[in-house]
Regions:
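Surface-exposed, flexible loop/turn segments at secondary-structure boundaries
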Residues: 202
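Conserved phosphate-interacting/catalytic interface
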Residues: 1-186, 232-584
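Residues immediately within or flanking Cys/His clusters that coordinate Zn2+
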Residues: 188-191, 223
């Protein structure tokens, strides 16, 4: 995965220089060329601030260490720049950080003369007091001590000065050499082979660029570590911290910035987890099978199989060389107490992905509950939603397994089958139509898990299905409609009273229900009674020697599918002359 991320950075030209990172600055304290205070102004056209593609940056681990609290170069938090904090505990570290901010400004004055005016401004207690009073008046939204701030001298921001990158590169290298000389970066282990490039390097002591964008799924707002060894149990051979996965600082930053960029552009949150897909070579949006799975508006989902077949044929004929040999990658992530949890990682050929997505929609195809037509192909999140009461209840691990089933043409997880069955059963007992995506997933499970899956598992009713459990479900559907035709609404009917028992112990229950059906048949006129009698006999004839005494999870799910498809079939094909009489 890390090699794929490094390749993405190289292919896209993603800038990942140590000591620089994207930042968004919300405020600027302003002064003239002599350092006289002029005011505080917001930056950017929106409430978030002004985004910079690359600014000089120190890693969080470098800001707090044995040398005391340090500041960011030429920008920092409002609390430290203005000594503005409502929390008494924050005032000492903010003062220390403010002093370090001034120290960095002084070190830059020879290269960036405007920094001298900034030093004059921020060393003046009266100017700082006026700035604190002014910033408290800003908003909405109101300023916060943790907002980021820089200095504007005249009409130019310090961070925008042309000499800044060269000054910071030299200063940053000096800082790194100082850390190496104290052993914090080099330690006793010396040079090592870079895990990603194979070069001989001085490995980074920690990987300081955090993975951001996972705050809503267990991560921290400030980011989480992907490669981390902060416990002795995680280390080997006496290596400390991230030397257990030795990489130069540049390599560590490249994989982190690549993943951050992919999260921002491609990441999709799917019920407690984030799926981040990409391709080795760029793929147009209309050719992206991942989009078909996740977003799948109806018109897209309906043509997904045809589009996949078209792309596959083009690859085989050589008319789409851009797709032939292309590879896909997808990582499923969530946050966990400051660390990134990699829940799944898949990769493969584009051709395999297109075929898998086409099969996903084919296997999910199922009739509407009214039997009128095939249901619209469900979005991925509709499938997940059919397994739980609310999407937030979906386990991230289950979402990852379902994603793998869709993208890799793997078996539907058994845990998903159990949940889909439970939700469908509740709907049947309440005399409601179940979520069609749940029944579709049950069908897909059996399509992929059984040797007879593909010919037997049809979108519509299959009267020749090879499994008795399926026909047992069909029989209960017919008996329920027979009761309604004979008695009308009776409150708790056959389904409410016997569905659970019949789906678990069919031999014990269905025989008794067949015997009781004679009472219902006697209440119907001859033609309708004969019609129902033939239906019951036809289904019973599928049982063979005997009904199973008990049904396991797979059998109960086939029972539910047979029940559903029989109801859909009858609703669509009931005899016109008897429509009202047998309508349930």
């Amino acid at each position: 995965m890390l090699h794929a991320l490094l390749g993405y950075a190289q292919r896209t030209g993603l800038h990942a220089e140590p000591g620089f990172s994207p930042q968004t600055i919300r405020w600027a304290i302003c002064a003239d060329d002599d350092g006289n205070y002029l005011g505080v102004v917001p930056l950017g056209s929106d409430k978030k601030g002004l985004a910079f593609r690359l600014l000089p940056t120190q890693a969080q681990s470098a800001l707090v260490g044995k040398g005391g609290v340090r500041a960011q170069p030429l920008w920092d938090t409002v609390g430290s720049v203005l000594l503005w904090s409502k929390d008494e505990k924050r005032k000492p570290p903010d003062r220390e950080r403010h002093d370090n901010f001034l120290l960095l400004l002084r070190s830059a004055t020879e290269v960036i003369p405007e920094c001298q005016a900034a030093v004059t401004l921020l060393s003046d207690p009266d100017a700082l007091g006026r700035a604190r009073a002014d910033i408290e008046k800003q908003g909405p939204p109101a300023a916060r001590p943790e907002d980021k701030m820089t200095v504007r001298i005249g009409d130019r921001l310090l961070v925008d000065m042309a000499a800044v990158p060269a000054w910071w590169r030299e200063h940053y290298r000096a800082l790194q050499k100082a850390r190496e000389s104290t052993g914090k970066s080099r330690g006793e282990n010396g040079a090592m082979l870079d895990l990603l490039t194979g070069d001989v390097v001085t490995p980074a002591y920690t990987h300081d660029t955090k993975i951001k964008g996972l705050a809503g799924i267990g991560g921290l707002p400030q980011g989480d570590a992907l490669v981390s060894f902060d416990k002795a149990a995680f280390t080997s051979f006496g290596l400390e911290k991230s030397r257990n996965a030795a990489m130069a600082e540049e390599s560590a930053k490249r994989y982190a910035e690549s993943l951050n960029h992919l999260i921002q552009t491609n990441g999709r949150i799917l019920a407690g987890a984030m799926v981040v897909p990409w391709f080795k070579e760029g793929v147009a949006a209309e050719d992206d099978p991942f989009t078909w799975i996740v977003e799948a508006p109806e018109h897209t989902a309906r043509i997904a199989e045809a589009r996949a077949a078209e792309l596959l044929e083009a690859i085989r004929k050589g008319t789409r060389p851009d797709l032939a040999g292309n590879r896909y990658y997808a990582v499923t992530l969530s946050g966990a107490a400051g660390r990134v949890m990699v829940r799944d990682w898949i990769e493969g050929e584009f051709e395999e992905l297109a075929a898998a997505v086409a099969a996903w929609f084919t296997d999910l195809a199922i009739v509407w509950a009214d039997g009128s037509a095939l249901a619209s192909p469900p979005k991925f999140m509709a499938v997940v939603g059919a397994l739980v009461r609310e999407l937030k209840d979906a386990p991230a691990s289950l979402v990852a397994e379902l994603w793998r089933a869709a993208a890799r043409r793997k078996a539907v997880p058994r845990a998903a089958l159990a949940r889909a069955l439970g939700r469908a059963r509740l709907a049947f007992l309440a005399d409601e139509s179940p979520r069609v995506a749940g029944l579709a997933l049950i069908k897909a499970y059996h399509t992929r898990i059984n040797s007879w899956g593909y010919p037997a598992m049809q979108p519509y009713l299959n009267e020749n299905h090879p499994d008795v459990a399926y026909h047992a479900g069909r029989l209960l559907a017919v008996l329920a409609r027979l009761q309604y035709a004979a008695l009308g609404e009776v409150g708790a009917g056959v389904v409410q009273r016997y569905y659970i028992a019949a789906s678990q112990t069919p031999a014990l229950v269905l025989g008794r229900l067949i015997g009781n059906s004679k009472n219902h048949l006697s209440k119907l006129d001859g033609g309708l009674s004969f019609w129902f009698e033939n239906r019951i006999a036809e289904i019973v004839g599928r049982f063979g020697d005997r009904l199973p005494r008990t049904l396991d999870l797979e059998g109960q799910s086939l029972f539910a599918l047979g029940y559903y498809q029989q109801l859909a079939h009858d609703r669509a094909s009931r005899p016109a002359a008897k429509e009202e009489a047998i309508n349930a």
